[in-house]
């Protein structure tokens, strides 16, 4: 399953905050957003408006363009990994391990 953009942006924002060693409270105060709402945004539960994203980025002193670039790169990696996993799964569908024994039960048909 592909991650939602709001989840990926939330991950990027959380990583930026924790890399700076800052608390949710500090950033929420600086961004003038409730702590609970910022937490929801970081966890990908709420979709942040462009105004809110800008305020959070200002509070973190991280350019919005950097957050969006990081989110795009993260989504591209996740999509690539998902495609690779799907290709491996499809390639393995037709293979039966030599040690695997397939038992096909005998079916008798009764005619009434």
Swiss-Prot record:
Organism (species): Mycolicibacterium smegmatis (strain ATCC 700084 / mc(2)155)
Entry function: Key stress-response regulator that plays an important role in multiple regulatory networks in response to different stress conditions. Probably controls the response to vancomycin treatment; vancomycin induces expression of the clp regulon (clpP1, clpP2 and clpC1).
Gene3D superfamilies, sorted: lambda repressor-like DNA-binding domains
Domain HTH cro/C1-type: 13-67
Annotated region of DNA binding: 24-43
Induction info: By vancomycin, requires sigE.
Gene disruption: observed consequences: Depletion experiments (via anti-sense RNA) show greatly reduced induction of the clp regulon (clpP1, clpP2 and clpC1) after vancomycin treatment.
Lineage: Bacteria, Bacillati, Actinomycetota, Actinomycetes, Mycobacteriales
The name this protein goes by in its record: Transcriptional regulator ClgR
The organism's place on the tree of life at top rank: Bacteria
Entries under CDD domains matching the protein: HTH_XRE
Example of a GO MF term: DNA binding
Keyword annotations: DNA-binding, Stress response, Transcription, Transcription regulation
Keyword Lipid biosynthesis: no
